[in-house]
């Protein structure tokens, strides 16, 4: 009990709560030398409460990063200034300037962004030659981070220049699977990549680590119908859902995972499955909005959790409870029915 109270107190200290525009501006001024992560949240939104917990964990892992939560509706002047239209929204600041943004409850993406900004701002002092060598290695890793990498201004969800927006639209139109890097989030990468690839402008598209070009080149490739042969295609959602539902003999789509259910219904179904002794795998729908929405249509089942056996939907919690009470659950899980 005492240990739990101590952990809660530690998390409370690690995440600062801001209640006024003046306090926020003062914090921006004081935290110029460190990364500042601000969560615009609302107490009535359960996903915000969940992301506060995620942020508290990140605060323990990154003691040199300043984590702040700000109730969006309580400080409207700050929310309006930064165009906060929904919660949760996260803003990232360095040197009092906004360098990145994340909209929505995406815990893995928040963790990735924090780690990226921390690593980008913590190069040890060394000679110019060593710094250049380290940067080139980093750029090589970044350009190879995915089969198709787009270096752009902003994110695919929120492009911050017309050329980047057009590039994203072309890639989406051709169903091309790509990852992106926001050059506004890292000035060193932004300047270094120009020299590394001898290409002075953004956006820049890479396939297998090789520069394809900027927007004009991509438009030319689209016009000549070569783009589809160069860039990797994203699997269609229906195909992806078929693969996911057949990933294991017994698949549970839930909020959270085996170790940590993030809703009461998911927790109950885990307890039932664990009591059967049957092996199963899980998929956290909170980490993938496309799967979360797509599976509802794919299986014509509007709620979660959803249990599948050999790719076929068994049902949600109520169905699983009925099957257990009737003694039918175990044979179904074992594929005997």
Curated annotation (Swiss-Prot):
Keywords: Acetylation, Cytoplasm, Iron, Iron-sulfur, Metal-binding, Phosphoprotein, Repeat. Signal peptide: none annotated. Its main location: cytoplasm. Pfam families: Glutaredoxin (PF00462), Thioredoxin (PF00085). The modification Phosphoserine is found at residues 119, 122. GO terms for molecular function: identical protein binding; iron-sulfur cluster binding; metal ion binding; protein kinase C binding. [2Fe-2S] cluster binds at residues 161, 263. GO terms for cellular component: cell cortex; cytosol; dendrite; iron-sulfur cluster assembly complex; nucleus; Z disc. The modification N-acetylalanine is found at residue 2. PROSITE patterns: GLUTAREDOXIN_2, THIOREDOXIN_2. NCBIfam families: Grx4 family monothiol glutaredoxin. Homodimer; the homodimer is independent of 2Fe-2S clusters. Heterotrimer; forms a heterotrimeric complex composed by two BOLA2 molecules and one GLRX3 molecule; linked by [2Fe-2S] clusters. Interacts (via N-terminus) with PRKCQ/PKC-theta. Interacts (via C-terminus) with CSRP3. Interacts with CSRP2. This is Glutaredoxin-3. It comes from Rattus norvegicus. The gene is Glrx3.
């Amino acid at each position: 009990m005492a240990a739990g109270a101590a952990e809660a107190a530690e998390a409370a200290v690690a995440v600062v709560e801001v209640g006024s525009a003046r306090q926020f501006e003062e914090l921006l001024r004081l935290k110029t030398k460190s990364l500042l992560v601000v969560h615009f949240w609302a107490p009535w939104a359960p996903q915000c409460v969940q992301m506060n917990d995620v942020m508290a964990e990140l605060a323990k892992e990154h003691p040199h990063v300043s984590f702040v939560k700000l109730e969006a509706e309580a400080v409207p002047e700050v929310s309006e200034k930064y165009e906060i239209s929904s919660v949760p929204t996260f803003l990232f600041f360095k040197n009092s300037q906004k360098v990145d943004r994340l909209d929505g409850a995406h815990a893995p993406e928040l963790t990735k962004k924090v780690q990226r900004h921390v690593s980008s701002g913590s190069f040890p002092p060394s000679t110019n030659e060593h710094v250049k060598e380290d940067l080139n290695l980093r750029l090589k890793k970044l350009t190879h981070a995915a089969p198709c990498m787009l270096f752009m201004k902003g994110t695919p969800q929120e492009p911050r220049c017309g050329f980047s927006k057009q590039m994203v639209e072309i890639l989406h139109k051709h169903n091309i699977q790509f990852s992106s890097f926001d050059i506004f989030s890292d000035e060193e990468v932004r300047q270094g990549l120009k020299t590394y690839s001898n290409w002075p402008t953004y956006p820049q598209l890479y396939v297998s680590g090789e520069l394809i070009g900027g927007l004009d080149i991509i438009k030319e490739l689209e016009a000549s119908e070569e783009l589809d042969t160069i860039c990797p295609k994203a699997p269609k959602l229906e195909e992806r859902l078929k693969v996911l539902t057949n990933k294991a003999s017994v698949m549970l789509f839930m909020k959270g995972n085996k170790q940590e259910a993030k809703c009461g219904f998911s927790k109950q179904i885990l307890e039932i499955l664990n009591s059967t002794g049957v092996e199963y795998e899980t998929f956290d729908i909170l980490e993938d909005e496309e799967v979360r929405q797509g599976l509802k249509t794919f299986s014509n089942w509007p709620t979660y959790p959803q249990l599948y056996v050999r790719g076929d939907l068994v049902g949600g919690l109520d169905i699983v409870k009925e099957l257990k009470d009737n003694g039918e659950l175990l044979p179904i899980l074992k594929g005997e029915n």
